Amino acid sequence: MSNYPKPINRLIEALSYLPGIGPKTAERLAFHIVSMDETKVNHLITALQDSRDKVFECSTCNNLTDKDPCTICQDESRDSNLICVVQDARDVTAIEKVQDFQGKYHVLQGVISPMEGIGPDDLNLKALMDRIQGEGITELVVATDPTVEGEATAMYLNKLVKPLGVRVTRLAYGLPMGGDLEYADEMTLQQAFEGRKEL
């Protein structure tokens, strides 16, 4: 690897396990950590350990939590008949930042992707079906990414859930705020026209 002391080499290697962290960035981070005062290093160590040891999936929705069920599932002010289906826990956080959705969530932990060998059985669909049948869900908002895999997952969910009398909706997508039409691709423009609404 390099002529650095073994502990630094191990730290660089460990940091490079993180997504988006290449060898150079891992090296910079390692040297930054080595130069940090002991209190901050201990805080970092504790935060890493706690995140790994004390965070788990909610038994109801599969969102990441440190209590079971999670605070969203426990919140009685939320509409229990409305579930937003997302790919992973980061999507829950993104939607919650908007502070507009007042239903509950279900985290699929992925999307259907035959190219990656991920089929419906690899997703958290059984738990979703159990919730739909046991909790009286009336609407499912599918909030998977607008990709081929996200669309395939949305279509599969629609076929699976619609026969149960549950309304299945999809998040609208199209042009971003502040975007220029001239830079939009054809698919985005098509979806923007399909999702248009009356003013």
UniProtKB/Swiss-Prot annotation:
GO biological process, any: DNA recombination
Protein biosynthesis found in the keyword field: no
UniProt-listed InterPro entries: DNA_Rcmb_RecR, Rcmb_RecR, Rcmb_RecR_Znf, TOPRIM_dom, TOPRIM_RecR
Keywords: DNA damage, DNA recombination, DNA repair, Metal-binding, Zinc, Zinc-finger
Keyword DNA repair: yes
Occurrences of domain Toprim (ranges): 81-176
Pfam family, one: RecR_ZnF
Source organism superkingdom: Bacteria
Annotated coiled-coil segments of the chain: none
SMART domains: TOPRIM (SM00493)
ZnF segments: C4-type: 58-73
Annotated Gene3D superfamilies: 3.30.60.80, 3.40.1360.10, 6.10.250.240, RecR Domain 1 (1.10.8.420)
Any GO MF annotation of the entry: zinc ion binding
NCBIfam families found in the cross-reference section: recR
Role: May play a role in DNA repair. It seems to be involved in an RecBC-independent recombinational process of DNA repair. It may act with RecF and RecO.
Family statement: Belongs to the RecR family.
Protein name: Recombination protein RecR
Primary gene name: recR
